[in-house]
């Protein structure tokens, strides 16, 4: 799992300096941005320096044990590096269900907030005594909320729901995040318009499962995602809307129709499949079969031939046999999936699968992870070869992390943070980040493409 650190905005000296570290997924990042906005609006100032901060807020991740270990490591680093008078506020998924793993470090914590309880960040910071408030309250239930974006100015995440209705055997997210809570449609559209007004050109919709949106309040318990998309697409402008985390049983003809008819709803979907063997899928408590998955992927690629499909798979699920794993390898080699995240099964306490017999050894899981990763890499190389010589419209994200002589860009088939990018090595025509250009693909290295800027994209 990719765990990232987000630091925010250095401003002038103040006795009320705050420093945020946000770990885990983009949904966590949105919560961090809201907390940051609340504090900035209240007169606090943000600093990039951990050592200078008066208040340090760590938003933890608990998706897997590796994520919890990373959260603990960051907390230890903060405790050692902070100045003596600084206070630490701990929040996020880990404190809601795995606080016992933090017990040795709790004496160093000034305040503990439950996952998503962003509303109380101000009271936590201003509390004169050590405190704790573990609740499932989400900012989705609040009214007007400030938010300070930490992403590059041209893209932002828009969370439309919190919690999860699914009960997959390997997952503990429902016990951490609670039941599905959909954000009111009018609030979503208000935030969408505000992001556009701020100059955001790519809005990435996120939830535990976008397709579950509205099932907690609609009379027929059906998804209302199509209503959200239709309302958004009424807004004028040449923006991009990208969908992440859409379960396979929630991708219906209405969603496909919208992608087909309006280029602003990008032909890109992130569909977590997790496996392809029917016995394993059943043990995982997934609601789709291999046959249904193949039918869906065939429909998507028939209706929208240029679509990009992202997915995730788990190797080494309890009881997974060599033959069942080979089914997964064969499926990946068929090239159905463009961008893929692969995880070794993690035995998470509290999940159904944690108590299953026939747990797969770590050595076998590591071997299977390597085999499946290699199969996908071969697919990507074949696909990248076909792209060489083509010209794509792409947005310039910024400098490449390895060198300011290079830039990074993305076309519609590449989501930020999770997918490969285009490495731009000829960019004399670029006048600003966040703008779209026509880029000729000249080669590739690993998963990433290499390209040169031809000219500005039409409309820029």
Curated annotation (Swiss-Prot):
Domain TRAM positions: 385-455
Q: Which GO molecular function entries does the Swiss-Prot or TrEMBL record give?
A: 4 iron, 4 sulfur cluster binding; aspartic acid methylthiotransferase activity; metal ion binding; protein methylthiotransferase activity
Q: What does the entry's cofactor note say about binding and number? A: Binds 2 [4Fe-4S] clusters. One cluster is coordinated with 3 cysteines and an exchangeable S-adenosyl-L-methionine.
Q: Which cofactor does it need?
A: [4Fe-4S] cluster
Please indicate which superkingdom the organism of origin belongs to. Bacteria
Alphabetized PROSITE patterns for the sequence: MTTASE_N, MTTASE_RADICAL, RADICAL_SAM
Disulphide connectivity of cysteines: none
> How is this protein annotated for GO cellular component?
cytosol
What processes does the entry annotate via GO biological process terms? tRNA modification
Please list the residues that bind [4Fe-4S] cluster 2: 164, 168, 171
Database matches in CDD domains: Radical_SAM
Where mainly found?
Answer: cytoplasm
Top EC category: transferase
**What keywords would UniProt list here?**
4Fe-4S, Cytoplasm, Iron, Iron-sulfur, Metal-binding, S-adenosyl-L-methionine, Transferase
- What are its E.C. numbers? 2.8.4.4
- Report the locations given in the UniProt record: Cytoplasm
Can you tell me which residues bind [4Fe-4S] cluster 1? 25, 61, 93
Task: Give the matching InterPro entries.
Answer: Elp3/MiaA/NifB-like_rSAM, Methylthiotransferase, Methylthiotransferase_CS, Methylthiotransferase_N, Methylthiotransferase_N_sf, NA-bd_OB-fold, Ribosomal_uS12_MeSTrfase_RimO, rSAM
Q: Enumerate the spans annotated as Radical SAM core domain.
A: 150-382
Q: Where is the MTTase N-terminal domain?
A: 16-130
UniProt record similarity statement: Belongs to the methylthiotransferase family. RimO subfamily.
Role played: Catalyzes the methylthiolation of an aspartic acid residue of ribosomal protein uS12.
Protein name per Swiss-Prot or TrEMBL: Ribosomal protein uS12 methylthiotransferase RimO
């Amino acid at each position: 799992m990719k765990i990232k650190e987000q630091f925010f905005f250095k401003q002038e000296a103040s006795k009320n300096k705050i420093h945020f570290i946000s770990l885990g997924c983009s949904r966590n990042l949105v919560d961090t941005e809201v907390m940051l906005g609340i504090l900035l609006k209240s007169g606090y100032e943000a600093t990039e320096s951990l050592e200078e901060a008066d208040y340090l807020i760590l938003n933890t991740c608990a998706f897997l044990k590796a994520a919890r270990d990373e959260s603990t490591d960051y907390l230890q680093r903060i405790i050692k590096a902070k100045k003596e008078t600084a206070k630490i506020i701990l929040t996020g998924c880990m404190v809601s269900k795995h606080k016992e793993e933090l017990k040795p470090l709790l004496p160093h914590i000034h305040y503990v907030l439950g996952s998503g309880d962003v509303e109380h960040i101000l009271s936590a910071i201003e509390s004169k005594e050590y405190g704790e408030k573990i609740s499932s309250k989400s900012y989705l239930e609040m009214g007007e909320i400030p938010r300070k974006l930490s992403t590059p100015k041209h893209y932002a995440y828009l969370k439309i729901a919190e919690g999860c209705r699914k009960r997959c055997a390997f997952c503990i997210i429902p016990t951490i995040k609670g039941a599905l809570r959909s954000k009111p449609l009018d609030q979503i559209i208000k935030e969408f318009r505000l992001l556009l007004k701020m100059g955001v050109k790519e809005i990435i919709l996120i939830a535990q499962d976008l397709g579950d949106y509205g099932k907690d309040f609609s009379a027929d318990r059906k998804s209302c995602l199509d209503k959200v998309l239709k309302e958004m697409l009424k807004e004028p402008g040449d923006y991009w809307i990208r969908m992440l985390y859409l379960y396979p049983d929630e991708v219906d003809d209405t969603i496909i129709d919208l992608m087909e008819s309006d280029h602003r709803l990008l032909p890109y979907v992130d569909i977590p499949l997790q496996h392809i063997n029917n016995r394993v899928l059943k043990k995982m408590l997934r609601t789709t079969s291999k046959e249904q998955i193949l039918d869906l992927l065939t429909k998507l690629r028939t209706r929208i031939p240029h679509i990009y499909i992202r997915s995730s798979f788990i190797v080494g699920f309890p009881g997974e046999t060599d033959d069942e794993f080979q089914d997964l390898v064969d499926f990946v080699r068929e090239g159905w999936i463009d961008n893929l995240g692969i995880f070794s099964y993690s035995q998470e306490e509290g999940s159904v699968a944690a108590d299953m017999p026939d747990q797969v050894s770590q050595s076998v899981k590591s071997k299977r992870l390597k085999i499946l990763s290699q199969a996908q890499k071969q697919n990507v190389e074949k696909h990248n070869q076909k792209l060489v010589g083509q010209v794509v419209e792409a947005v310039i994200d910024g400098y490449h992390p390895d060198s300011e002589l290079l830039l990074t860009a993305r076309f519609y088939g590449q989501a930020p943070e999770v997918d490969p990018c285009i490495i731009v090595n000829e960019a004399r025509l670029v006048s600003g980040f966040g703008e779209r250009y026509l880029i000729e693909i000249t080669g590739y290295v690993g998963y990433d493409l290499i390209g040169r800027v031809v000219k500005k994209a039409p409309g820029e």
